[in-house]
């Protein structure tokens, strides 16, 4: 049986690591994109020979070019059965006081980095008539206050996925989007760190302007684990997107996403009032 190669960006930790290990166990030859060699060595030690680390920073044109050369060598004419765009980062804080360089970096990773990765590896996906799975978020369907930059980057990912799904259909290439809500083990680390960084970047007088919503949202984040999705649920969605004869265009993952999508469908005024109630 010919090997089924799948490239996963952002495999060093969290969801990306879980995906890489699980797909290696399910018969894929996983090419795990990592930024540090040590992270790759750790993954390889745990997964065995079905996983090969590839140094890949989606925000670096040079790194992408080198990774493309390496992946071509590793796949030896088989192409990519799957490309999973998982690398991403979060930033939370008032839009008014978010530095432009932070905004640029979030979009460089979450949007431009995904586009550059697809552009670089699409010939290999086409060669295998493979699949593309983009890891988005419920934030790509519902805009939360104080997450405007992250929201915008995920809405952009949803839009480009919709366009790409139609553009690539003539070659039999399927494009799916996975939309997790809070995920266990990641949510406190990522959300609290990003939230703390946003808060710490403010001058004391600026911080005072937003003290109430900061306090409310900090409490909300601390309780998100109660409805957080297990990594396994996200992995299942990715696996289905890579293997199903009829993959979905979108996979909502987690109990919280079902509830939040109900909120997203409300009239604007009602939705705004509900969101305002969370922060005031």
Outline where the language-model segments fall:
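Substrate-binding pocket helix/loop in short-chain dehydrogenase/reductase
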Residues: 94-95, 102-104
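Conserved glycine-rich cofactor-binding loop
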Residues: 12-13
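The beta1-alpha1 cofactor-binding region of Rossmann-like NAD(H)/NADP(H)-dependent oxidoreductases
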Residues: 56-69, 100
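Conserved NAD(P)H cofactor-binding loop of Rossmann-fold oxidoreductase domains
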Residues: 86-91
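Active-site helix of classical SDR
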Residues: 118, 153
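Residue(s) in the substrate-gating loop at a strand-loop-helix junction
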Residues: 137
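C-terminal beta-strand-loop-alpha-helix "lid" module of Rossmann-like NAD(P)-dependent dehydrogenases
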Residues: 171-222
């Amino acid at each position: 049986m010919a090997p089924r190669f799948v490239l996963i960006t952002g495999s060093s930790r969290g969801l990306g690591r879980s995906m890489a290990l699980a797909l290696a166990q399910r018969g894929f030859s996983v090419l795990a994109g990592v930024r540090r060699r040590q992270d790759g060595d750790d993954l390889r030690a745990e997964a065995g020979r079905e996983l090969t680390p590839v140094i890949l920073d989606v925000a670096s044109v040079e790194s992408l070019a080198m990774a493309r050369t390496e992946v071509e060598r590793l796949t030896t004419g088989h192409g990519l059965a799957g490309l999973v765009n998982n690398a991403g980062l979060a930033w939370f804080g008032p839009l008014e006081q978010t530095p432009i360089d932070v905004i640029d970096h979030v979009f460089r990773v979450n949007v431009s980095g995904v586009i550059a990765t697809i552009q670089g590896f699409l010939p290999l996906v086409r060669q295998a008539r493979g699949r593309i799975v983009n890891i988005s978020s419920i934030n790509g369907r519902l805009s939360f206050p104080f997450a405007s930059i992250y929201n915008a980057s995920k809405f952009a990912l949803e839009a480009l996925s919709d366009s790409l799904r139609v553009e690539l259909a003539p070659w039999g290439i399927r494009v799916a989007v996975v939309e997790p809500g809070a995920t266990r083990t990641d949510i406190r680390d990522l959300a609290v760190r990003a939230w703390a960084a946003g808060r710490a970047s403010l001058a004391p007088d600026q911080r005072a302007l937003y003290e109430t919503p900061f306090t409310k949202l900090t409490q909300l984040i601390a309780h998100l684990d109660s409805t957080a999705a297990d990594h396994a649920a996200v992995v299942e969605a990715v696996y289905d997107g890579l293997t199903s004869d009829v993959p979905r265009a979108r996979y909502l993952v987690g109990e919280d996403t079902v509830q939040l999508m109900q909120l997203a469908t409300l009239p604007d005024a009602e939705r705004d009032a509900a969101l305002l109630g969370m922060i005031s």
